[in-house]
Each structure stands twice: as C-alpha cells, then as structure tokens.
Amino acid sequence: MAKKKAFTPLFYLSFIVFLPWWISFSFKKCLESWITNWWNTGQSEIFLNDIQEKSILEKFIELEEFVFLDEMIKEYSETHPQEFRIGIHKETIQFIKIQNEGHIHTILHFSTNLICFVILSGYSIWGNENLVILNSWSREFLYNLSDTVKVFSILLLTDLCIGFHSPHGWELMIGSIYQDFGFGYNDQILSGLVSTFPVILDTILKYWIFRYLNRVSPSLVVIYHSMND
C-alpha cells in the first residue's frame, strides 16, 4: 500500500513532465500536412505583424541587392539582362518558399502550444485528487530534507535562474518562446524581458524567504544568509 502511494505521485509527476512533449510531437505530425495544404491552397492573405513585415521587406531588399551584385560581378547586368531577371525571379520564389515555411511552422507551433495548454488545464482540473496527493508528497519530501540541503538547493536554483550568468539562458528561453508563438525577433523587447524578468523573480524569492521561511524555519534563514555571504 505504501509503495502504491509513493508510485502514484511519481507517475503523476512524470505524466505532467512528458505529456506536453508527447502531445506536441503527436499533433505536429498530424497537423503539419493539413496546415501546409491549407496555407498553400486556401490562404489568400498573409497576416503579418509590423515587425514581421518590416523584417521580410528588409530581407527582400537584401536579396535583391545580393543578386544584383552577383550579376554585376559576372558582368551579366549589361550583357545578359534576361539572365538577371531570371535570377531575381528564381531567388524571389525561393525566398517566398522560405517565408511560407516560416508561417506554417509558426501556425503549427501556436496550435500545438494552445492544445497542450488546454489539455493540461483540463487534466489539472479533473485530476485534482492526484494533484493534492502530489502536493502532499512534495511537502513531505521537502520536510524530510536537512536545512543544509534545503539551503543548498535554494542557492543552486537562484544562481541558475537569477545569477550573473543567467541572462544568456533567459535570452535563449524567452527568445524561443517569443518566436514559438509567432512574434518576430526584436532585440529591444527581448532585452527588456531579459533585464526585468530575473529581477522580478529575485524580488519574489527574497519576499518568500523573508515571510515564509522566517516563519516556518528561522534556522533555515540563518543558514541561507551564512552560505550566501
């Protein structure tokens, strides 16, 4: 009976961890062909935000300048104007294909993320009993740890998330999430999120240490400040 109680929260925890990945992988395989066919046949208008439209226009201008320079080097611009127009046409078609693939992947990622969120939300509501068991199991596991191990875990987590080297990790994670939902890459927005989000987490952590840990385990706070200093 005790083994069954211990197995239930572990199974539920592994289910929560691996379920989003499995759902995302499955729906991507199922929806990719349908979204590709819908975009290439039924989509008559391209919906872009201002950042994406500006980025595509800049890339197209760079492409045109690159082809023009390449033809000038080959001395085709004066002697073979027809080849120059054909080269522009081919490169433009290739550029449009790349942009279409980008839009298809954006729609695919957004759809799978939305489906994962809905399924996990429904499972967390319907599996409330398992969530309570997981919560009680987590509390019991944490309470059985020594104060030194708890403080070490807190310091390790804070250094990973809000340490001096953490902005690089936050930049990669926020950038991938930002583009995964269909937003164009923007250095100003990304820099703003990277510079403010860790600060907010640091403030929340310090408030939690001051209010919760100081009330539950004052010795833990003393050890934390000693190791932190």
UniProtKB/Swiss-Prot annotation:
Q: What is its main location?
A: plastid
Q: Which PANTHER family match?
A: CHLOROPLAST ENVELOPE MEMBRANE PROTEIN (PTHR33650:SF2), CHLOROPLAST ENVELOPE MEMBRANE PROTEIN-RELATED (PTHR33650)
Concerning its family, UniProt says:
Belongs to the CemA family.
Q: What is this protein called?
A: Potassium/proton antiporter CemA
Which taxonomic lineage is given here?
Eukaryota, Viridiplantae, Streptophyta, Embryophyta, Tracheophyta
Query: Which Pfam family, giving just one, matches this sequence?
Result: CemA
Keywords, alphabetical: Antiport, Chloroplast, Hydrogen ion transport, Ion transport, Membrane, Plastid, Plastid inner membrane, Potassium, Potassium transport, Transmembrane, Transmembrane helix, Transport
Q: What domain of life does the UniProt record list for this protein's source?
A: Eukaryota
Please provide, alphabetically and separated by semicolons, the GO molecular function terms listed in this UniProt record: antiporter activity; proton transmembrane transporter activity
Q: How does it sit in the membrane?
A: Multi-pass membrane protein
Can you tell me which residues the record assigns to a coiled coil?
Answer: none
Location(s) in or outside the cell? Plastid, Chloroplast inner membrane
A GO cellular-component term linked to this record: chloroplast inner membrane
Q: Which reaction does it catalyse?
A: K(+)(in) + H(+)(out) = K(+)(out) + H(+)(in)
Q: Does the keyword Lipid metabolism apply?
A: no
Function according to Swiss-Prot or TrEMBL: Contributes to K(+)/H(+) antiport activity by supporting proton efflux to control proton extrusion and homeostasis in chloroplasts in a light-dependent manner to modulate photosynthesis. Prevents excessive induction of non-photochemical quenching (NPQ) under continuous-light conditions. Indirectly promotes efficient inorganic carbon uptake into chloroplasts.
One of its GO biological process terms is:
potassium ion transport
Sequence intervals crossing the membrane: 7-27, 114-134, 189-209
User: HAMAP family of this UniProt entry?
Assistant: CemA_PxcA (MF_01308)
Chloroplast as UniProt keyword? yes
